[in-house]
Amino acid sequence: MRLRPLPLVVVPGLLQLLFCDSKEVVHATEGLDWEDKDAPGTLVGNVVHSRIISPLRLFVKQSPVPKPGPMAYADSMENFWDWLANITEIQEPLARTKRRPIVKTGKFKKMFGWGDFHSNIKTVKLNLLITGKIVDHGNGTFSVYFRHNSTGLGNVSVSLVPPSKVVEFEVSPQSTLETKESKSFNCRIEYEKTDRAKKTALCNFDPSKICYQEQTQSHVSWLCSKPFKVICIYIAFYSVDYKLVQKVCPDYNYHSETPYLSSG
């Protein structure tokens, strides 16, 4: 088998077009080779106006190779913030999902906190603070807890009573309910503890004198069972110069973020 040489047909117009294109390709290639020589000024113009388009420019705004100078730093920072914005948009819904609290429907439910019932009584010779909370055990019973903290002279009684309890001054205040009311009201004292400390300090009404003070801290726990509608908190306070009887009937079915405040 013989190989025959093919005749070369030269078209002047086509030859001139190929020659011009090859010249521009060589010129652009020289511009890219010159990029490694750190030439100022000419590098940016050659890359922008060249007909050769890098495939990476179809997806990224600038060449992935870092270039010295302020323009390269600005371009890299711009791409960094774009990437960070895209990552933030993706991760933000996931973060919100993680931060969503898990609601547990357990057996025990805390209805109120220590600040839900707050009573502060101040006189010349006594400073009294009473706080309370209610815990629903979920089995038809709930507990009522009280804490008393008093400084000075006086007697304090805090108890649970039915709404029919008459507010009146009694000769000897009792901290427990009567037998008939206990049976119909279904509430009883479960735990009670009182700590007392005696001390002397300067009198509030006359700092030049020394007065006898008694500091009392007590904890009382009531246990109630259903059926019940409304229970009331009954406070009886007796001192040498001041007497107070107060009945509070909060609505335990209404969960309010603002606690009940009573001051006298």
Curated annotation (Swiss-Prot):
The keyword Secreted applies. One of its GO terms (cellular component) is extracellular region. It comes from the Eukaryota. Glycans are attached at residues 86, 139, 149, 155. Residues 91-169 are annotated as: III. Residues 1-22 form the signal peptide. Residues 170-178 are annotated as: IV (linker domain). Keywords: Glycoprotein, Secreted, Signal. Residues 23-90 are annotated as: II. Its main location: secreted. Coiled coil: none annotated. GO terms for molecular function: signaling receptor binding. May be proteolytically processed at the boundary between the N-terminal non-conserved and the central conserved domain in neuron-like cells. Belongs to the neurexophilin family. May be signaling molecules that resemble neuropeptides and that act by binding to alpha-neurexins and possibly other receptors. This is Neurexophilin-2. It comes from Homo sapiens.
